[in-house]
Amino acid sequence: MTTITPIMVKELRERTGAAVMACKKALQETNGDMEAAIDLLRKAGDAKAAKRAGKTAAEGVIVIAISKDQKKGFMAEVNSETDFVARDTNFMAFASKVAERGLAEGVSDVAATLALPIEPNSSSTIEDERKALVNRIGENIQIRRVASLSSDGVVGHYSHGGRIGVLLALDVPNPELVKGLAMHVAAFNPQAVSANQVSTEFVEKEKEIFLARAQETGKPANIIEKMVKGQVEKLLKEVSLEGQSFVKDPEKLVGDLLKAEKAKVLAFLRFEVGEGVEKESQNFADEVMAQVQGNR
């Protein structure tokens, strides 16, 4: 039996917003499994907002580079330990160079990106520059993830303050439409282009939660089945791009807009700084003490 510590309870409470005793009980029932405890709280209706479960305090920036012909795009998340460093000019210059070189060389994974020359004919690599930056700034700097998109139509992008970045590929050259759709993806965070592309794992997980809540009503099985089916259908519309109301014209669904424009979204990618990354929390006094000790 796993010992449930106050730190575990604190983390679960921060990630779900549920009451302390509810968090402790959920951890006990799941033998300390944090993700299982989150699901248990959601089924019981104790989590205030499921979206909080994925939020973290990791810092950094999302950088994007687009080719001149708008046929290719490259995006990277570069992380730092603090927001202060994330706004540092040297850090930003490095991050921008990562995007520039990644686009130029057509890489699509972190290892290949780190191995790239920092300049076309340089013997120094991006990894060399990263290490030098760590020594210069005094914080751990990492290229967490990279991605690329290409299209014979157009690749558009949107960046929201360097915290959220989107690449989106259309099958037709429509720069205005692709920009609006990229902005929409940044704001609404759809999981897939269409409902039938939403992962089965996600659907089944949500279905279990809907079923658990519906069963608490005490209604007949056939009614519960209809309730769950309706909730799943509603969810699929909410999490798929084509089923969402367009951010610039809420009266129109994205799917209807695409039909009217005779366009198709081939793919999209959305990065948000710190998604899914756990960061050790420290209070201000601890940070000051750590800096003092580090300067001895």
Curated annotation (Swiss-Prot):
Belongs to the EF-Ts family. It comes from Coxiella burnetii (strain CbuK_Q154) (Coxiella burnetii (strain Q154)). Residues 82-85 are annotated as: Involved in Mg(2+) ion dislocation from EF-Tu. The gene is tsf. GO terms for molecular function: translation elongation factor activity. Signal peptide: none annotated. Keywords: Cytoplasm, Elongation factor, Protein biosynthesis. This is Elongation factor Ts. InterPro entries: EF-Ts_dimer_sf, Transl_elong_EFTs/EF1B, Transl_elong_EFTs/EF1B_dimer, Transl_elong_Ts_CS, UBA-like_sf. NCBIfam families: tsf. Pfam families: EF_TS (PF00889). It is found in: Cytoplasm. One of its GO terms (cellular component) is cytoplasm. Associates with the EF-Tu.GDP complex and induces the exchange of GDP to GTP. It remains bound to the aminoacyl-tRNA.EF-Tu.GTP complex up to the GTP hydrolysis stage on the ribosome.
